[in-house]
Amino acid sequence: MHEFVTICIMAAALGMDAFSVALGMGMLKLSGKQIFRIGLTIGLFHVAMPLAGMAVGKWLSGHFDVIATYIGGGLLLVIGVQMALNAFSDHEAEGLKPAGWGLLLFAVGVSLDSFSAGLSFGILGTEMFVTVGMIGAMSMVMSWIGLIVGSHFQKFLGAYGELLGGLVLIGFGLKIMLPL
């Protein structure tokens, strides 16, 4: 029972991280179909990354944690800068979009922290399928909530909403890269 509570708390924490970042991404003008795909992709990556972390194991954790931090923060920073720069542009952004490779890069950036969580769970020997299922489901649902809430804010804020979303992602990227 204690292990299940630990898994639930970790899944909620990783889900809140996904919610926060999705809130910023939700400031883009997204369709319901895009919101569904983004949340599903983030959920799938929150299954794949802990699995990868569990598979890699303890020997790589000391080296990859630092690299994962900078990669994840850097990806969020790039997406945030691109959103902020294109907030008041008359044409559609040519940079990273929440589709195709842009969506994959976004999902990787959001889910890199779950790789480290997977390392921890692998070391502790937790039940793999329950763990990654809980993390994936929680992250997917929290992403959908963040995207929907962000899209409602965007309706009121217009182009300023996309700028705000970009600044949120920049802030999270910097927070990840430069922990205080």
From Swiss-Prot:
Stretch forming the signal peptide: none
Principal localisation: membrane
Transmembrane segments: 4-24, 40-60, 64-84, 103-123, 129-149, 156-176
GO molecular function, one term: manganese ion transmembrane transporter activity
Keywords of the record: Cell membrane, Ion transport, Manganese, Membrane, Transmembrane, Transmembrane helix, Transport
Localization per Swiss-Prot or TrEMBL: Cell membrane
Bilayer topology annotation: Multi-pass membrane protein
Cellular component GO terms held in the UniProt record: plasma membrane
InterPro entries, per the entry: Mntp/YtaF, Put_MntP
Keyword Cell wall biogenesis/degradation: no
UniProt family annotation: Belongs to the MntP (TC 9.B.29) family.
Function of the molecule: Probably functions as a manganese efflux pump.
Protein name: Putative manganese efflux pump MntP
